């Protein structure tokens, strides 16, 4: 069992999955992972399937040099987006693995949220390509390590309404407080 970069807050209500040295582009996978971070599990699976079918795009925010614009990226507040099919398939497989781990721990799968997802660079794999005049250039691949942690969503606690007998205090800015103090000092 490998070491995870972050342990969940409540290990009894969470599950983990990871993949090492995966032959999928690091940059595309990073952007795909950032798009599904903090999503509910069901929505993330549906979103990745839509990416594979090119119905929704992955917004490219960090590694966006030379990435073309697409209209589907507008819903994320950006202009650049792509449909990294292989990255989506690898992440979908990892989410299914984490979901089966959740079933094994008897967690409620419908309440799972992607609490933590991280993509790290793995050691590059070298190949070579032959060029003109007897030269040889490197032909590198950029694999990655992926880890994901799912947690059950906590129920939101309802806020207690203020009672009528105690009036709610009005919040004042620092400027107004200073003016009030000045008035008090003058009087």
Swiss-Prot record:
GO cellular component: cytosolic large ribosomal subunit
Database matches in SUPFAM superfamilies: Ribosomal protein L22
Single GO MF descriptor: structural constituent of ribosome
Signal peptide: none
Gene3D superfamilies, per the entry: Ribosomal protein L22/L17
A Pfam short name: Ribosomal_L22
Keyword vocabulary terms for this entry: Ribonucleoprotein, Ribosomal protein
Region entry Disordered, spans: 161-187
Source species, domain of life: Eukaryota
Family matches, as InterPro entries: Ribosomal_uL22 (IPR001063), Ribosomal_uL22_CS (IPR018260), Ribosomal_uL22_euk/arc (IPR005721), Ribosomal_uL22_sf (IPR036394)
One of the protein's GO biological processes: cytoplasmic translation
Ranges that cross the membrane: none
Basic residues compositional bias, start-end: 169-178
Record PROSITE patterns: RIBOSOMAL_L22
Family, per entry: Belongs to the universal ribosomal protein uL22 family.
PANTHER family documented for this protein: 60S RIBOSOMAL PROTEIN L17 (PTHR11593:SF10)
Name under which the protein is recorded: Large ribosomal subunit protein uL22
